């Protein structure tokens, strides 16, 4: 599997946003990334789907690289209202918990990226407090579920 380039990450973000906004179909976005940007079709589908999951605050189960996470968060912060950045951070934290439950790996660099956004002042204090409380609660629940297994 070849490494996904920054150009492919940028294109995947643009296509993912276009799908999210209803401007193009998911299949068109994937095909365009595959043909126009030489991106593996499965990776293209994962990245486009993950952009939508970030914007909607939903857990995503197909991982993407740290460079993509950094790029996606920076663009969401620039392109959308604060609530979308909050949703994206929530989605990443949910992914971290999901990944921890299936692989026993903590994804510390991804968690640090979220922490940087939470402490950077980009989000209003009330949003930072809410997201930190949610993350603490989700972590406690995951630890309890792990202990029961």
Name every feature range the model reports, one short phrase each.
Residues 4-27:
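Short, amphipathic alpha-helical "recognition" segments used to contact nucleic acids or chromatin
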Residues 26-37, 51:
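General secondary-structure propensity
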Residues 34-46:
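Short, basic interhelical loop/turn and adjoining N-cap
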Residues 39-40, 57-61, 80-83:
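Short acidic, glycine/proline-enriched loop segments that cap or flank alpha-helices
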Residues 48, 52-55:
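DNA major-groove recognition helix of helix-turn-helix
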Residues 56-74:
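Short Lys/Arg-enriched helix C-cap and helix-to-coil transition segments
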Residues 80-139:
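Helix-turn-helix/homeodomain-like alpha-helical modules used for DNA recognition
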Residues 139-146:
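Long, compositionally biased low-complexity regions that are usually intrinsically disordered
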